[in-house]
């Protein structure tokens, strides 16, 4: 396994891209080579914040210059740019959702496979210390209750709340249950945008596990909580605090308490370190393209159910 520093670049220098640039710049295993954005001023500003980093406006110029790259562009560009980088022999960490359509996601997965490249997808909550502690405790998941509420942010108007927020929780539930749902029920409302801003979903899995999920980007407070019920145990995780608590009924019928997520690390940094480790070892990443495609597929099923039942559009005051 080579110990040389990996040459790295970030494609897309918006808010997410800027955070990735920071994480890479902090890594002792990488050399930040380039910041790429179609907006030359944005690329220049991003590169200027990191000495030795070159500003580029065309991602194609990365061929031969870097070993790894982050794709943090709008979702509609993920497939084109991701596949192009993979074909150029570059390992890729691509932001979620993996692509705009399932077909595009499958193309990314196949391209990575055909060219022997690592493809990891940025489902950041998988690197939340509370979630990682939860994973180690799951036995037979029976019921999930998950809430993810945010204040409105104009940056995400190109996607609905299901693909913007709920997909994190869909990915986690699929990873913990290990199966696809056999039934999907969903309702959604458009409040402040032309996309669904609030969604409520019920997933039923083979074996009887149920997951109730609510996501909203029209809230006065930020809420990120997961509750899992399984035989003799209730586990609560606070994504924001990266911690939680497990309540377990013992043989003596007494309830024991166990705190979770004590070894905290910034998820973005943990994600990058994990990606670098996969690249060096040529091993499967923690969040594979295949897993991200399944999460996207379920999200598309949810959106189809919402449209099937007619997404409610909030009335303006003069219509009431």
Predicted regions and their residues:
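N-terminal Rossmann-like dinucleotide-binding module
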Residues: 1-50, 173
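C-terminal helix-rich "cap/oligomerization" subdomain common to oxidoreductases
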Residues: 1-2, 68-71, 277-320
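Active-site loop of classical SDR/Rossmann-like NAD(P)-dependent oxidoreductases
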Residues: 19, 259-273, 287
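Beta-loop-alpha module in the N-terminal Rossmann-like domain of NAD(P)-dependent dehydrogenases
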Residues: 20, 50-108
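Hydrophobic residues in well-ordered beta-strands that form the structural core
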Residues: 94, 119-121, 237
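A contiguous active-site-proximal alpha/beta segment in oxidoreductase catalytic domains
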Residues: 99-156
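Mid-domain beta-loop-alpha active-site segment that forms a flexible
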Residues: 122-129, 152-181, 291-292
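Contiguous beta-strand/loop segments that form the cofactor/metal-binding neighborhood of enzyme cores
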Residues: 170-243, 269-284, 318-320
